[in-house]
């Protein structure tokens, strides 16, 4: 057991981009190592992502962000065929171990290395979901060009081009889950700081939607 201190990746947000970029690369290298591992036999992971879990995340977003936070009617959203199609598409893809919440607060920097923490939600899923968690993190608020640069670095680390359709699908799904969590924690646990993170997440979602067709 090693004390990793309190220096999360988020704590370095004010650094110059060249320095911060290297920290993100270290984090992505750790994520790729995780994704390259076989499923462990020594201890069970959480139930893998499947169509039902993806649909639950969508309902979570609808209930807490659209309904409770924005005061919108949610039935028409939840009944839209594109959501079922999104869940079915993601559930049909091969899986590997994923962190599920690899945002900047869950990456700690210690002794020049990146360490993944709070991995109790680890399960089978798509690596692109973890990548989206990192580059579209509502806390870190990376600039669009910075996110694009990190995506290019991810392709170098993984050794293969990123499938745009899969990445967009994972990013949409992750952003819905993330925004639902911000609204839920902010309103129901009294942690209003989370509500201030919603606009950045919504902006990422808006930018992804125009090209997000799964047809």
Predicted features by range, described:
Residues 1-56, 60, 67-70, 92:
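ATP-binding pocket architecture of kinase catalytic cores
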Residues 24-27, 54, 76-83, 172, ...:
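Hydrophobic packing residues in well-ordered alpha-helices of helical domains and bundles
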Residues 34, 84-131, 138-142:
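Active-site acidic catalytic loop and adjacent metal/ATP-binding pocket
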């Amino acid at each position: 057991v090693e004390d990793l201190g309190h220096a999360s990746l988020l704590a370095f947000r004010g650094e110059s981009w060249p320095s911060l970029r290297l920290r993100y690369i270290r984090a992505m290298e750790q994520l790729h190592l995780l994704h390259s591992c076989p499923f462990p036999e020594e201890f069970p992971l959480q139930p893998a992502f499947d169509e039902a879990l993806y649909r639950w995340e969508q309902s979570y977003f609808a209930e807490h962000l659209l309904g409770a936070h924005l005061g919108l009617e949610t039935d028409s959203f939840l009944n839209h065929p594109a959501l079922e199609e999104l869940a079915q598409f993601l559930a049909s893809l091969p899986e590997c171990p994923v962190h599920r919440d690899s945002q900047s607060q869950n990456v700690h920097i210690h002794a020049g290395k990146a360490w993944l923490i709070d991995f109790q939600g680890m399960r089978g899923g798509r690596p692109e979901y973890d990548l989206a968690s990192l580059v579209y993190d509502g806390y870190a608020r990376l600039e669009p060009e910075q996110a694009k640069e990190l995506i290019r670095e991810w392709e170098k680390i993984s050794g293969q081009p990123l499938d745009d359709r899969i990445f967009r699908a994972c990013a949409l799904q992750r952003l819905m889950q993330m925004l639902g969590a911000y609204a839920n924690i902010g309103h129901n646990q009294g942690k209003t700081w989370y509500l201030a993170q919603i606009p950045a997440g919504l902006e990422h979602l808006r930018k992804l939607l125009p090209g997000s067709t799964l047809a």
